[in-house]
Amino acid sequence: MTDTDVQAPKIEFPCERYPIKVIGDAGEGFADLVVEVIQRHAPDLDSSTLRLRDSRNGRFLSVQVLITATGVEQLQAIHLDLRATGRVHMVL
């Protein structure tokens, strides 16, 4: 491996306190929608980890939660379902 080769960090599953940040248009029910979608795949979601942040101009809202990630398949399913809502711009 050379100095220019960068490898993504390995995640060991299950991974407790795995952060998921979702950014979408601010609007009524956006945070509830995000939590609902994530809870389908991570029923043990602790709502006390929910963090909301408005963008500077108030147009966007970021919703961050911590889950216990059980595997890549779970994370991919969460991402796909969030994008399918049509209200999500980014999932980090």
UniProtKB/Swiss-Prot annotation:
InterPro entries: UPF0250_YbeD-like, YbeD-like_sf. Coiled coil: none annotated. Disulfide bonds: none annotated. GO terms for cellular component: cytosol. It comes from the Bacteria. Pfam families: DUF493. This is UPF0250 protein Avin_08440. It comes from Azotobacter vinelandii (strain DJ / ATCC BAA-1303).
